Each structure stands twice: as C-alpha cells, then as structure tokens.
C-alpha cells in the first residue's frame, strides 16, 4: 500500500528532475529550434507537479497558485507557437 507521504516525496523528486531538465534546456551549448518553448513546457510541467504535491498535502490555495503559474507558462507556449505559425504565412 502507498501513502500520501510517498506520493508527495515522489512528486517532489519529479519536480527536482523536471527543473534540472529545464535548466539544461536553457543552457544548451548550441541553440535548438523551439528551445524556448521546450523550456516553458518543462517549467509548466514542474508547476503542475508542484500543484499535485500541494493538493496531496491539503494546501489548496498553493495548489491553485501553481496551476495558475502552469497556465501562464502554457499561454506563453501557445503565443510563441502561434506567432511562429503566423510568420510562415
């Protein structure tokens, strides 16, 4: 059987790994197409994981803030992609 404490610990580990990936993406030796978008998606993933961890701890207000952060990051992703698609016309 699993406990909520185990879930929180695993979510925190996933957040750490995800944030490390975001840092790696941000600091690539050679620039990559959509590097900025990949970084934002990764940060959004970390925010979603953080929200889940807060929910598992009964911290609904903090969870909502993290969800809003993820939403803002994903809005930025869509803005970049839509802008790039618009440039191709």
What is the predicted role of each segment?
Residues 2-89:
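Long, low-complexity or tandemly repetitive, helically biased scaffold regions used
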